[in-house]
Structures are given as structure tokens and as C-alpha cells.
């Protein structure tokens, strides 16, 4: 049997129960090849669909410089620039808790540099934490393929050290000791709320 274009029909072995296609045989449970932002996006979609949590990425603020109005009913933006975010990347609600966090990736194998965290972001994290929010930094070491949740209560110690010009980064060992490892799995790939559960339990004891 041929298709209308003359090409012969071939059975789909995956549908017929034969050899699996590459899409199913090469499933990877690690995070290689996918950005941290994409992993979080997939996890948040899973949480929302499963009625577990409502967490979203905040839109990057844009400063519009030049707008053209070819018609009264239309506006064309000719020039615009992304502005430096004034807060963190993500926020939402999980089991009655306000969640607020910043997500960062680094290719560095031994430490996480602090020069790409901004003062106003840390100030926002501090304010949210003081209101009993669950605030943290999510860090992925790309080369090591490891992801950690570093609570704000621990992060602020390293941030003060950085601002005092003592050390410009947080070592991997310091993050492993003070943070929570988030292992990759199947669904969702990055189930970071399991680490959040541990953080909530620990901080509920610390804040009593």
C-alpha cells in the first residue's frame, strides 16, 4: 500500500508493540540539556495541574523608549529595553505559605559567585522573609548537574560576608552543608517542593 505521494506505507513499530522509538528509549533523568528555568517551568505546570501549588515566574520589566502610532487603534513599539528586575524570579502560594525565590545557574564547579545577585533583590528577599515567607535561592551547578535550595536565613550570612569584602562566592561545600539537595527524577523532573517541605519544617522550629 502506498501513500498518495507514492511513498510506501511502513508500520509504526512503537504503536505495533515492536522496537521502541528513540523518544522513549533515551529518557534521561538528569538535568543535562535543559535550563534551570525550563525545569522550574515544567515543575510549576505540574504543581498547578495537580492542585499542589500556584507558583509563577514574574515577567521581566520592560522600559519602552519609542512608540509609533501608525493608526489610532494600533501602537508599534520601536525601541524597548529589559530593565533589571527589582525583585526575585518566582513567587506563589503553597499550602498556605507564601513562596518567593531567585533561581541561578553557574558553570563554576567549586563555588557560586555572588556578583550576579543585586542588592534590591536581597532587600526584597529580606522583607518577604521578615513577613514569614518561605524565601530561598535555587542554585544549579551546570557542570556538576546538581541543584540546591539555599534558604534565605543561610544565604544572608554569605551575603554579609560578600558585602564586607571577605569572600565573593559561596563554595559548593558550603551550599551542600547549608542547603537542601534537589535530585532529578521523572515527574516532575525537579520536585523542589520536597525540599521546601523540609525547609518549612526546619524554619517552623527555628522561628518559634
Curated annotation (Swiss-Prot):
Q: Write the record's keywords in alphabetical order, separated by commas.
A: Cytoplasm, DNA damage, DNA recombination, DNA repair, Endonuclease, Hydrolase, Magnesium, Metal-binding, Nuclease
A GO cellular-component term linked to this record: cytoplasm
EC id: 3.1.21.10
What does the cofactor section's free text say about binding? Answer: Binds 1 Mg(2+) ion per subunit.
Q: Does the keyword rRNA-binding apply?
A: no
Site description Transition state stabilizer, residues in chain:
104
Identify this protein by name. Holliday junction resolvase RecU
Q: Which cofactor does it need?
A: Mg(2+)
Query: In UniProt terms, what function does this protein have?
Result: Endonuclease that resolves Holliday junction intermediates in genetic recombination. Cleaves mobile four-strand junctions by introducing symmetrical nicks in paired strands. Promotes annealing of linear ssDNA with homologous dsDNA. Required for DNA repair, homologous recombination and chromosome segregation.
A Pfam match: RecU
The EC class name is hydrolase
Name of the gene encoding the protein in the UniProt record: recU
Q: Where does the UniProt entry say this protein principally localizes?
A: cytoplasm
Q: Where is Mg(2+) bound in this sequence?
A: 87, 89, 102, 121
Per the UniProt entry, what are the Gene Ontology biological process annotations, in alphabetical order?
Answer: chromosome segregation; DNA recombination; DNA repair
Q: Give compartment(s).
A: Cytoplasm
Q: Which organism is it from?
A: Staphylococcus aureus (strain bovine RF122 / ET3-1)
Q: Which reaction(s) are listed as its catalytic activity? A: Endonucleolytic cleavage at a junction such as a reciprocal single-stranded crossover between two homologous DNA duplexes (Holliday junction)
> What are the recorded GO MF terms, alphabetically?
endonuclease activity; magnesium ion binding; nucleic acid binding
Similarity comment: Belongs to the RecU family.
Amino acid at each position: 500500500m502506498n501513500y498518495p505521494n507514492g511513498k510506501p506505507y511502513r508500520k509504526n513499530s512503537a504503536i505495533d508493540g515492536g522496537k521502541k522509538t528513540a523518544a522513549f528509549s533515551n529518557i534521561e533523568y538528569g538535568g543535562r540539556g535543559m535550563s534551570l528555568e525550563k525545569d522550574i517551568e515544567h515543575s510549576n505546570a505540574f504543581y498547578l495541574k495537580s492542585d499542589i501549588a500556584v507558583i509563577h515566574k514574574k515577567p521581566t520589566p520592560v522600559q519602552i523608549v519609542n512608540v509609533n502610532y501608525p493608526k489610532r487603534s494600533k501602537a508599534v513599539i520601536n525601541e524597548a529595553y529589559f530593565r533589571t528586575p527589582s525583585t526575585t524570579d518566582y513567587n506563589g502560594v503553597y499550602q498556605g505559605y507564601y513562596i518567593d525565590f531567585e533561581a541561578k545557574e553557574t558553570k563554576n564547579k567549586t563555588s557560586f559567585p555572588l556578583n550576579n545577585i543585586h542588592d534590591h533583590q536581597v532587600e526584597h528577599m529580606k522583607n518577604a522573609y521578615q513577613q514569614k515567607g518561605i524565601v530561598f535561592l535555587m542554585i544549579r551547578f551546570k557542570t556538576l548537574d546538581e541543584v540546591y535550595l539555599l534558604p534565605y536565613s543561610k544565604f544572608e550570612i554569605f551575603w554579609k560576608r560578600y558585602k564586607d569584602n571577605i569572600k565573593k562566592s559561596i563554595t559548593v561545600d558550603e551550599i551542600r552543608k547549608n542547603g537542601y539537595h534537589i535530585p532529578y527524577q521523572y515527574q516532575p523532573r525537579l520536585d523542589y517542593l520536597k525540599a521546601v517541605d523540609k525547609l518549612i519544617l526546619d524554619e517552623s522550629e527555628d522561628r518559634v
